[in-house]
Regions:
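Residue-level detector of secondary-structure transition/capping positions
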Residues: 27, 45-48, 82
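Conserved beta-strand-loop-beta-strand hairpin that lines the nucleotide-binding pocket
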Residues: 1-6, 51-133
């Protein structure tokens, strides 16, 4: 039976370490080996960086990490859930941000079995990732 786990994360870089540790624990429960867990942690870290900096119109104030976990399969959604965004993003381009086709998304696609970039009706972004054994 699939289990669902959801985290609500402030859109600040200092929370990425916590997110990586949490998703590593979830992946271990789903019975992935150490190399697969490292791949999942790296992909989720890249997705969180992409979503938190590429939220609708600026830096996301918060985002969610949702996992659907069953033995040998992990489905992960990272979604911008902000009601608002930091205004400084509107006046300049973030020099550290990749475009959707850039290295971060390439890394995610190379590490996960399936990757989708989704827009919800409110125009907010979601990165869906699936890893199977």
């Amino acid at each position: 039976m699939a289990e669902k786990i959801k985290f609500i994360i402030p859109g600040k870089p200092e929370y990425l370490t916590m997110v990586r540790l949490a998703i590593g624990s979830v992946a271990e429960v789903a019975d992935f080996n150490i190399d697969e867990i490292d791949d999942i942690k790296t992909a989720v870290g890249e997705a969180c960086k992409n979503i938190s900096c590429h939220g609708k119109d600026g830096f996301a104030e918060e985002y969610t990490l949702e996992c659907i976990c069953e033995k040998g399969c992990l489905e992960i959604y990272v979604t911008d859930t902000s009601a608002g965004h930091k205004i400084e993003k509107l006046s300049k381009i973030c020099a550290d941000c990749p475009n959707e086709g850039d290295l971060g998304i390439f890394v995610i696609k190379s590490l996960m079995k399936e990757v989708e970039l989704l827009d919800n009706p409110e125009g907010k972004k979601t990165i869906k990732m699936v890893k199977r054994k």
